[in-house]
């Protein structure tokens, strides 16, 4: 259910978020829009409006999955603990190709992120909470901050393809179920060298390549979270080449 101008009153503060997306009566997504024709409007103003809602009508965000902000030109999504710089665009509607710059970012986000299948998948498998400790050097007081993190579009599509490929390689998917599936397409269609067909049960899941700073550790967490459900709680072995990566990955998984 999508509601326009949904009114929320809390502590005598009536507020009307532009769009609220409900799933089974639960407000999971809040969308704040600004008018592209207004020269004073910006996507940052939409973010600030969300911050105002969080302060004045916090109960609206009790079960919130994520929020979307847009000024009509740009459109980005983030969690309720994300700073403005952590809000990210959803750049593909199908995970195959990046959307054309001629297509509205909001349209791409709605088609790629807010369709029923992707939305529920994001809620269930691609949102995590990370706790960080910070000690005051003067008082010695330790504060623990909890940050809610959500997969970016490249992590979402990469992890789901990795899961599909792993299930195929392990023989968990029957050949007839692969008919028309993207895991059976040739890597050559992406300009990569590869075989024409990936047989079921060949024990070759493949390689996921990420650039530096693109969230490799979280992608591993998302992948592990999905694969343990699909494959009857398998053992996952993580191999690193540096001690600092051991600590980093341990903290991320923990």
Set out the residue ranges of the language-model regions.
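ATP-dependent helicase/translocase motor core
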Residues: 1-235, 244-254
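Conserved H-loop
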Residues: 241
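Conserved SAM-binding loop
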Residues: 238
């Amino acid at each position: 259910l999508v509601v326009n101008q949904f009114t929320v009153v809390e502590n005598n503060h009536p507020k009307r978020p532009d769009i609220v997306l409900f799933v089974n009566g639960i407000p999971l997504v809040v969308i704040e829009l600004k008018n592209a024709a207004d020269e004073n409007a910006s996507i940052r103003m939409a973010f600030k409006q969300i911050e105002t809602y969080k302060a004045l009508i916090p109960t609206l965000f009790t079960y919130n999955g994520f929020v979307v902000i847009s000024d009509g030109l740009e459109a980005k999504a983030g969690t309720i603990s994300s700073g403005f710089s952590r809000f990210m665009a959803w750049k593909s509607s199908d995970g195959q190709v990046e959307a054309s710059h001629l297509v509205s970012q909001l349209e791409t986000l709605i088609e790629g992120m807010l369709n029923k299948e992707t939305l529920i998948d994001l809620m269930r498998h691609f949102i995590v909470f990370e706790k960080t400790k910070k000690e005051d050097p003067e008082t010695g007081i330790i504060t623990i901050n909890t940050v809610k993190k959500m997969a970016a579009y490249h992590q979402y599509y990469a992890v789901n393809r990795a899961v599909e490929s792993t299930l195929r390689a392990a023989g968990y998917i029957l050949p007839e179920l692969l008919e028309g599936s993207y895991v059976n397409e040739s890597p050559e269609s992406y300009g990569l060298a590869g075989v024409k067909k990936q047989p079921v049960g060949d024990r070759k899941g493949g390689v996921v390549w990420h650039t530096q700073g693109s969230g490799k550790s979280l992608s591993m967490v998302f992948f592990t979270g999905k694969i343990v459900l699909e494959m009857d709680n398998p053992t996952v072995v993580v191999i690193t080449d540096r001690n600092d990566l051991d600590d980093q990955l341990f903290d991320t998984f923990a």
